[in-house]
C-alpha cells in the first residue's frame, strides 16, 4: 500500500479536523464546517483521498496504469480542495493519499496518526441514506475510533454552518 503525506502545517498544539475528499455533493458542507471550526480555534484541516484499487487486475501493466491514472486524478482533486481550504483558513492543509478501501484506509490513518483530533463527514440527504461511508463509520465503527465524529448534513446552508461554527 502506498501512502503519501504532505505536512506543511504549523506544528504545535493545533486541533486538526480531517475531511475525506471524494466526489460527493456533501463534501462542500463538511469542508466548510471543518474550515470554520479550525479558524475559530486556530486549528488545522487535513484532507484524505483514498484511491480505490483498480477493478481490472488481469494484467499487471494495465492495473499499474489504471492506478497511476487514479492517483493523478486524486492529486488534481486534492489541489482544488486544498486551495479552497487555504482560502478559507489561511493555512495549507495536511494532505494524505492512501490506496485501498475507503473505510479501511480512514480507520488505519486515524489509528496511525495521533495528531488528528476530529473526523468531519458530510451526509447525503437523499432517500437512500447518508451515504456508505457515513453509514459504515457511524453504525459500525464509531465506538472504536480514536477521535470524535461530526456528521454535517449535506443540505445545510453556508450561513447556517457559519452560525454553528
Model-derived features with residue positions:
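Small/aliphatic-rich secondary-structure junction motif
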Residues: 9-61, 144
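Acidic, proline/glycine-rich short linear motifs
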Residues: 4, 49-76, 159-165
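Short, well-ordered secondary-structure micro-motifs
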Residues: 30, 57-60, 107-108, 131-132, ...
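Structural beta-alpha unit
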Residues: 1-8, 86-119, 163-165
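General small-molecule cofactor/ligand-binding pocket signal
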Residues: 46-48, 94-98, 150-152
Amino acid at each position: 500500500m502506498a501512502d503519501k503525506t504532505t505536512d506543511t502545517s504549523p506544528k504545535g498544539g493545533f486541533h486538526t479536523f480531517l475531511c475525506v475528499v471524494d466526489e460527493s455533493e456533501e463534501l462542500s458542507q463538511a469542508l466548510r464546517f471543518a474550515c470554520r471550526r479550525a479558524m475559530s480555534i486556530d486549528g488545522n484541516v487535513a484532507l484524505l483521498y483514498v484511491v480505490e484499487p483498480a477493478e481490472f487486475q488481469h494484467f499487471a501493466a494495465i492495473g499499474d496504469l489504471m492506478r497511476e491514472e487514479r492517483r493523478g486524478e486524486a492529486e488534481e482533486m486534492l489541489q482544488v480542495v486544498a486551495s479552497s481550504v487555504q482560502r478559507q483558513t489561511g493555512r495549507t492543509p495536511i494532505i494524505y493519499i492512501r490506496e485501498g478501501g475507503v473505510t479501511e484506509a480512514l480507520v488505519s490513518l486515524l489509528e496511525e496518526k495521533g495528531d488528528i483530533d476530529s473526523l468531519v463527514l458530510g451526509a447525503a440527504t437523499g432517500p437512500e441514506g447518508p451515504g456508505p461511508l457515513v453509514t459504515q463509520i457511524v453504525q459500525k465503527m464509531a465506538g472504536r475510533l480514536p477521535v470524535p465524529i461530526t456528521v454535517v448534513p449535506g443540505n445545510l446552508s453556508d450561513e447556517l454552518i457559519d452560525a454553528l461554527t
